[in-house]
């Protein structure tokens, strides 16, 4: 499907798994920050400035939206991979499982999860105010159409990135938006994912997260005047046409985790993929153990 209003917007939605793979490999599209922020379509700048993916004040973008040709890409990915290699503990798993069993509210769960996953980036306890603000950034474009929600999301994004800029400092390899994004992902996406796990202790997490994908879309921007191998009646406009991969639909269709954590292949899949799956599986196992240890209900 294509939504095209001359001089206003040009967006193409692709949900077929094989088409997504083919377009991704074609070289016709790239990550959004292939172009300078000021040159991107107006609605991209408007929306992403209120998300965890972009720091408008410092003009910084999350790693997944940077082209692989960016000079800092390899260093940033290596830093994240190194930090992810620091595993969680059994005590972390048990604590989170107990919180889920007790039906702790999302705000408290997000705070505790941030200590497990994101403390490794800042070397200190992440304040509750920051994990709360991280939950307020935009998740969908529709939310950006609500003025009060948009203003609050911009403020929340600024507060989280300001905290990360202070905590990470200028001397380390940590990137402000990469750290801020991970805090937001834990506060919003991991919290939701573990609720899903707690509600279904029998289905393996690999099947859960393809049947119910956590990320539904991935944006790309045209870098060539192309009709995408005949899919389009008219060519894309480089630097203007945005292609939205409906990776959630592709994950459900194919049961392929590389659509849950990327665009259908291991290249540039989420750095946290293995950590995330292992942690979710261990929490699921701990919850099963708690359930089996629970005394039986008295007969009536």
Please place each PLM-identified region on the residue numbering.
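N-terminal membrane-proximal hinge/A-helix region immediately C-terminal to the signal-anchor transmembrane segment
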Residues: 1-49
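Conserved aromatic-histidine-acidic binding/catalytic patches
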Residues: 11, 102-110, 148, 152, ...
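Cytochrome P450 C-terminal heme-thiolate binding region
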Residues: 13-16, 200-300
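Catalytic cores of PAPS-dependent sulfotransferases
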Residues: 15-24, 28, 69-84, 88, ...
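Cytochrome P450 catalytic-domain helical core, especially the substrate-recognition surface
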Residues: 37-126, 130-167
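Short, amphipathic alpha-helical segments that act as regulatory/interfacial helices
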Residues: 115-122, 191-198, 281-288
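Charged/polar, low-hydrophobicity segments characteristic of intrinsically disordered regions
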Residues: 142-163, 178, 207-224, 300
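Central I-helix of cytochrome P450 enzymes
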Residues: 159-210, 272, 280
């Amino acid at each position: 499907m294509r939504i095209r209003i001359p001089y206003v917007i040009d967006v193409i939605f692709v949900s077929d798994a094989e088409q997504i793979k083919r377009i991704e490999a074609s070289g016709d599209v790239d990550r959004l920050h292939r172009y300078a922020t000021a040159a991107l379509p107006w609605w991209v700048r408007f929306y992403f400035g209120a998300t965890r993916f972009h720091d408008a004040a410092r003009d910084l973008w999350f790693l997944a939206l940077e082209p692989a040709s960016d000079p800092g890409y390899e260093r940033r990915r290596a830093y994240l991979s190194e930090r992810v290699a620091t595993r969680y503990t059994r005590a972390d798993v048990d604590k989170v499982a107990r919180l889920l069993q007790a039906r702790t509210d999302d705000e408290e769960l997000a705070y505790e999860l941030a200590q497990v996953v994101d403390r490794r980036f800042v070397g200190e306890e992440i304040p509750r105010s920051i994990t709360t603000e991280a939950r307020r950034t935009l998740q969908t474009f529709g939310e950006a159409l609500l003025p009060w929600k948009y203003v609050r999301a911009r403020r929340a994004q600024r507060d989280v990135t300001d905290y990360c800029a202070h905590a990470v400092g200028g001397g380390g390899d940590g990137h402000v938006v990469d750290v801020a994004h991970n805090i937001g992902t834990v506060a919003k996406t991991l919290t939701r994912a573990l609720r899903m796990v707690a509600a279904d202790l029998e289905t393996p997490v690999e099947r859960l997260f393809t049947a119910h994908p956590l990320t539904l879309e991935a944006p790309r921007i045209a870098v060539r005047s192309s009709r995408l191998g005949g899919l389009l009646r008219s060519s894309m406009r480089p630097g203007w046409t945005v292609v939205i991969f409906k990776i959630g639909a592709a994950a459900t269709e194919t049961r392929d985790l590389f659509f849950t954590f990327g665009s259908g292949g291991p290249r540039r899949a989420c750095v946290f993929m293995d950590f995330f799956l292992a942690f979710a599986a261990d929490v699921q196992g701990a919850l099963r153990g708690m359930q089996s240890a629970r005394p039986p209900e008295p007969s009536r």
